């Protein structure tokens, strides 16, 4: 019995997580965050309908991303999903809900009604033939700026000064160093641009890039991302880039760095502040 007494669902223990891989093994690679939870690299929870032969599951990353996979016609599971997502204690101020099939997209529309919006996303994978330009870009840093790989100190500094959500993505600085990596450009010890592993799974790393507003459009994002990609290549990791279909600046940077779009997919997004949703949809020209 879990979360308000739903007696037909079970939350898995961490050493049981791999039981759900069969439910989305053939799904697209954009489920990086889900594999990261299953593989124990990043924190999260997993719920199933049957611990002997599960037919569907909900994977919850501490970052706010969720995945539903398996049988979309399971009425008991769908009731649980609505119940779980309706409780504020089960998420922060928002959630992202991903799916393993087109059937799930329609079912989620039905379950959540008008409580979430459907977004179009683009997934990019890096083209290995672009390595020579990546290496050149990574050594073009202007004087007075420093390019560094993140260590525990820089990770904690980033969490405290730039993006506190990384404390949910990674349980500690040491866990980040153990399972993830990142690069940053500094000037006088202060962050200018940072490229991190947002999510990781075996052999893949999903990129997160942030550049301070006053330093944008000056090439810093290109340089720090190039260093990140070069490290991936040397370590046998495939870099991934995931963004909203309407985010033209992100798509432009991805293509400049040598990423190719390999998938267009849909997911659902909910935020407790409807103005946040409205402004977001306007910003990225989403109807």
Language-model-derived ranges and their functions:
Residues 43-60, 181-195:
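Conserved beta-hairpin
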Residues 4-30, 130-171, 281-287:
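Short amphipathic alpha-helix that is part of the acyltransferase structural core
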Residues 171-212:
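A conserved beta-strand-loop-helix scaffold within acyl/acetyltransferase catalytic domains
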Residues 1-5, 44, 50-154:
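Acyl-donor-binding surface of acyltransferase catalytic domains
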């Amino acid at each position: 019995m879990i979360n308000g007494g739903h007696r037909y669902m079970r939350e898995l223990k961490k050493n049981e997580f791999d039981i759900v891989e069969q439910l989305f093994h053939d799904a697209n690679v954009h489920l990086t965050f889900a594999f990261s939870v299953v593989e124990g690299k990043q924190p999260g929870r997993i719920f199933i309908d049957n611990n002997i032969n599960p037919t569907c599951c909900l994977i919850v990353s501490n970052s706010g991303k969720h995945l539903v996979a398996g049988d979309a016609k399971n009425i008991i599971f769908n009731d649980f999903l609505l119940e779980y997502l309706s409780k504020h204690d089960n998420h922060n101020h928002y959630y992202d809900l991903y799916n393993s099939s087109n059937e799930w997209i329609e079912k989620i529309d039905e379950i959540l009604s008008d409580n979430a919006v459907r977004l179009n996303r683009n997934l990019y994978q890096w083209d290995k033939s672009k390595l020579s330009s990546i290496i050149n870009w990574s050594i073009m840093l202007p004087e007075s700026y420093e390019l560094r790989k993140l260590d525990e100190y820089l990770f904690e500094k980033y969490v405290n000064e730039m993006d506190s959500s990384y404390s949910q993505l990674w349980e500690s600085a040491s866990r980040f160093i153990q399972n993830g990596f990142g690069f940053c450009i500094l000037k006088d010890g202060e962050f200018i641009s940072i490229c991190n592993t947002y999510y990781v799974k075996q052999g893949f790393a999903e990129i997160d890039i942030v550049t301070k507003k006053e330093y944008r459009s000056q090439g810093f994002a290109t340089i720090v991302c190039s260093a990140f990609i070069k490290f991936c290549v040397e370590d046998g990791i495939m870099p991934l880039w995931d963004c909203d279909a309407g985010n033209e600046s992100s798509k432009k940077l991805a293509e400049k760095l040598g990423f190719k779009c390999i998938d267009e997919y849909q997911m659902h997004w909910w935020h407790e502040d409807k103005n946040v949703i409205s402004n977001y949809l306007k910003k990225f020209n989403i109807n």
